[in-house]
Design a protein with these regions (language model features):
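Adenylate-forming
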Residues: 340
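Hydrophobic (often cysteine-bearing) scaffold residues that line and stabilize catalytic clefts
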Residues: 17, 95-99, 118, 209-216, ...
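Short acidic/histidine-rich active-site segments
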Residues: 346-356, 362
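Adenosyl-5′-phosphate
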Residues: 1, 8, 343-350, 369, ...
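Cysteine-centered catalytic environments shared across enzyme families
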Residues: 1-323
């Protein structure tokens, strides 16, 4: 994981602007502690903080075209870069082995209309010095964070995290996933569109002769295999839940051979390391241990105490840049775990984010009234992932210079999984959620894991973690403070004391209105969208993101 920051639309280059860009970049150096690079020329400044994963020796950034007329700063991984390189063999002169350099080749060939060619996670800024134009773009789902801003002088700012823009420009906002901004057009435009974003009554998408479980199995194994490309040690996050267990089992299947040689040579680090964190005796730790023993990873179990978690919250909110209750709850143990992972020399981990959104894994999905409602909710959840789980996974890990990859959100896998008939994914009543995913990988996991009920990460690390947070924040925030919450926080007024507590810390770090508006604030039950609250009358009086809020479904419901 890297960090990018910079300024466009510069009329006259100055030392002051260059120093400003340097200060912006320093704010996100935790994302890329290995090297710093900067371009300053024409009407642009591009800064890059590097975490070296692919081609550590020559892949420093910014990257330049062979004639140095185009310059590029990227935070991301392009998983199909070898295929693209092959297409441009003899047509484009590559200077490095960096996976991201293919963006320059594509731009030189196709102009700005090349983004669909990429399969990867990315946020980038490209400056064409010859044309004095620039292009900013973000990956389809928003796995990689990106923000865009402006000032009164007409400068356009960009940064991997909002802390790179806070105090440096007049206003900013999250850069939308699946969008690009081209200086000639002057507005953000969508580049990523799919037929599955709209529900179709007549399911004409099942042309594939393979069973749904076989389609899922093949597509996910291919996604994990693609995402194992690395020139540095890597591992897997293994919570003991279904999603991380599936990813870990597939990764273990391919870990012994080097992906970059198509399995022709042994892997540089053939032992796959898995990592789990929780309070002592937490449900996740017990299950993670069972999975690790079954699939054969070198497993590392990290315990943290309630006090250690509480002590970290202020730092966690600074790094993850949100006051969303669910995200803070889940980010804290992940932040603590990332520190241990980095201390062991691991720079990249695979994680299980995205499966619940794709397959309707959150427990409230049991209440979906029909296939249309179910499918439309999965699409809504995917469209908001950049504000929640993607943000958590990326920034919690990046705080310690660790990159997170998410195979469930692989572009090709999404097209397979989201085109399945939603009836196949539904789990009415007591039917277990994500049944099609469980069936696809049941033979790779212990039975007790393959058919284990969904636990949200913040629950699975230990129920007392959430219970303690509720208790502490209920005491720390008075009834009078809550009564006047709208006066103190007119933008996205906190809906409960826990949110008020996190919001107060967030405001200390990021006092601007832009920062406040960058965080979503909606009623939710078990991580639902606001629209899904209509599925059950019991949801109307609830605002609790924990899965235990879904009575009649969760085995340990309140």
């Amino acid at each position: 994981m890297c960090g990018i920051a910079g300024i466009f639309n510069i009329k006259i280059q100055s030392r002051e602007l260059r120093n400003k860009a340097l200060r912006m970049a320093r704010k996100i150096r935790h994302r890329g502690p290995d090297w710093s690079g900067m371009y300053c020329g024409g009407s642009a400044i591009l800064a890059h903080e590097r975490l070296s994963i692919v081609d550590p020796q020559s892949g420093g950034q910014p990257l330049y075209s062979s004639d140095r007329k185009q310059v590029l700063a990227v935070n991301g991984e392009i998983y199909n870069h070898r295929d693209i390189r092959a297409q441009y063999a003899g047509r484009y002169e590559f200077w490095t082995g960096s996976d991201c350099e293919v963006i320059l080749a594509l731009y030189r060939d196709k102009g700005i209309h090349f983004l669909e060619e990429l399969n990867g996670i990315f946020a980038f800024a490209l400056y064409d010095e010859e044309k004095d134009e620039y292009l900013i773009a973000r990956d389809p789902i928003g796995v990689i964070p990106l923000y865009i801003g402006k000032d009164a002088e007409g400068h356009v700012y960009f940064g991997s995290e909002l802390k790179a823009l806070e105090g440096f420009c007049d206003e900013y906002e999250p850069f939308l996933p699946g969008h690009y901004y081209h200086s000639k057009e002057g507005t953000m435009k969508r580049w990523y569109t799919r037929d599955w974003m709209e529900y179709k009554e007549e399911n004409d998408k099942q042309a594939d002769s393979r069973s749904p479980t076989r389609q899922i199995q093949d597509a996910l194994e291919n996604a994990v295999h693609r995402q194992l490309m690395s020139d540095v040690p890597y591992g897997v996050l293994l919570s003991g839940g279904l999603d991380s267990s599936v990813i870990s089992a597939i990764a273990k299947k391919y870990a012994a051979k080097r992906i970059e040689t198509d399995g022709a040579s042994d892997a540089w680090w053939p032992q796959l390391h898995s990592f789990a964190i929780g309070l002592k005796g937490a449900p996740d730790l017990i299950k993670a241990r069972e999975v690790a023993e079954y699939i054969g990873t070198v497993h590392h179990e990290i315990n943290y105490t309630l006090q250690e978690g509480l002590d970290a919250i202020r730092d966690v909110i600074y790094f993850i840049e949100t006051y969303d209750v669910t995200t803070v709850r889940a980010s804290t143990p992940m932040y603590l775990l990332a520190r241990v992972i980095k201390s062991m020399g691991i720079k990249m981990v695979l994680s299980g984010e995205g499966a619940d959104e794709i397959f309707g894994g959150y427990l409230y999905f049991h209440k979906a009234p029909d296939a249309r409602a179910f499918h439309e909710e999965t699409v809504r959840k995917l469209s908001k992932l950049h504000l929640y789980d993607c943000l958590r996974a990326n920034k919690s890990l990046a705080a310690w210079g660790v990159e997170g990859r998410v195979p469930f959100l692989d572009k090709e896998f999404l097209d397979v999984a989201m085109q399945l008939d939603p009836e196949i994914k539904m789990a009415p009543g007591k039917v277990i959620e994500k049944k099609v995913l469980r069936e696809a990988f049941a033979d790779m996991l212990p039975s007790g894991i393959a058919w284990r009920q969904k636990e949200q990460f913040s629950d699975g690390v230990g129920y007392s973690w959430i219970d303690t947070l509720k208790k502490i924040t209920a005491t720390a925030v008075s009834d009078e403070q809550m009564a006047h919450a709208a006066e103190r926080f007119p933008i996205h007024t906190p809906m409960n004391k826990e949110e008020y507590y996190y919001r107060s810390i967030f405001e200390e770090h990021f006092p601007s209105e832009s920062a406040a508006r960058s965080v979503p604030s909606i009623p939710s039950v078990a991580c639902s969208t606001a629209e899904a609250l209509a599925w059950d009358t019991a949801f109307k009086n609830l605002n609790d993101p924990s899965g235990r809020a879904v009575k009649g479904v969760h085995e340990e419901a309140y």
